[in-house]
Amino acid sequence: MDDDSNQKPLFHMALGVLTSLTPPQHHIELVDEHFHDKINYDGDYDMVGITSRTIEATRAYEIADEFRKRGKTVVLGGLHISFNPEEAAAHADCIVVGEADNLWTTLLDDVANNRLKERYDSKDFPPVKAITPLDYARIAKASKRTKVDGTKSIPIYVTRGCPFNCSFCVTPNFTGKQYRVQDPKLLKHQIEEAKKYFFKANGKNSKPWFMLTDENLGINKKKLWESLDLLKECDITFSVFLSINFLEDPTTVKKLVDAGCNFVLAGLESIKQSTLEAYNKGHVNSAEKYSKIIEDCRKAGLNIQGNFLFNPAIDTFEDIDELVQFVKKNHIFMPIFQIITPYPGTQMYHEYRESGLITIEDWEKYNALHLVIKSDRYEPLLFQYKVLKSYVEVYTWKEILLRTLYNPRKLINLVTSIAFKKHLAAQLKAFERNHKMNPAMLSGVKPVMNG
């Protein structure tokens, strides 16, 4: 995602939660390099807390090491650290494993009283049964973010946890399988506070855009409908992650549209039936089903952003070409292409590592556009190049304009697609320059067939 992408929320949800959990007597300064914030290594801090995803882990360690050189107390936590505690421990005075809601105030009290432990594990504290409401006033005061109009998103969440166990997803192993839902009254208050501190109208009909960061809002249809009814009262637009199968229900689609949903991000994974079966989705999904749902939602006023995965052990270059044509034919809203990546904490990572299939553990390459697993059928750089070239192909000016024409919510479609195009073009140019690649190298490439 481009650092300046409109689709990027205003702040990292983990930072928002920790800020909201922090007792008022503590002063907080939020610094986020995603927004080019400058780090003050000489700041008078009693503690420096750093959170990161896998792709940012190396940079997180660099920052931690620099602060520790200057005698600062460093605490590391977040997704990557929780599943690589031994690795992280070499760069921190303390590591936090799992959700921090139930341990953060204890940790801060220990810092204040010079008794900080080397490790705090969420499992050693009472279960996190309720969701922490976001304190947008405090987040605004602590951060360097300014107010935005309706073309940039403000993060919020309604639920946490997911009972499913998809092999490539880290959620059930981090936030857990217990599905927790916010108190509707608290949610409504947060939305009003977020509007007050982070939104500026741009025109008479301008509404704030909220990015719902829930892992899977649609697990419980009753709770989903209740949440949508509440969001309808708030006079906002929003986007959300949902299973494509929930969108077969016309009532759910109507409630989404009426509540102000501008698009749903759905993991479609593939249009190839054998690939869907490999992901345990072949019994419920198909390319034909996707096309129908996308068209029905479009007619109802809802965009579907499709997320697709490519696996060199399963997908051929011809499969990738067919997917590109499918995306074009169906005018899929802001499609996302990713190479299958076994992130630490997932079942897939454990299985691939045990089988010796992971070839790269340079975390900076875990951006879903590098091939980090063994590939017997394709030369890794060629496979990466094919995916990246195909990604760029669905973001030509022609395709962007056609999608804008065919899909609802035209402004967000156009503005965000242009940001995607800019970012992808820069990535492709850098890839070709760094690896001395050109399109002719992809011509006539066939997979190596074993056996």
From Swiss-Prot:
It is an enzyme of class 2 (transferase). Residues 148-377 form the Radical SAM core domain. [4Fe-4S] cluster binds at C162, C166, C169. Pathway: Porphyrin-containing compound metabolism; bacteriochlorophyll biosynthesis (light-independent). Keywords: 4Fe-4S, Bacteriochlorophyll biosynthesis, Chlorophyll biosynthesis, Cytoplasm, Iron, Iron-sulfur, Metal-binding, Methyltransferase, S-adenosyl-L-methionine, Transferase. GO terms for biological process: light-independent bacteriochlorophyll biosynthetic process; methylation. It comes from the Bacteria. The keyword Methyltransferase applies. The keyword Iron-sulfur applies. Residues 1-118 form the B12-binding domain. SMART domains: Elp3. Its EC number is 2.1.1.332. It is found in: Cytoplasm. Its cofactor is [4Fe-4S] cluster. Involved in the biosynthesis of the major light-harvesting pigment bacteriochlorophyll c (BChlc), which confers a significant competitive advantage to green sulfur bacteria living at limiting red and near-infrared light intensities. This is Bacteriochlorophyllide d C-8(2)-methyltransferase. It comes from Chlorobaculum tepidum (strain ATCC 49652 / DSM 12025 / NBRC 103806 / TLS).
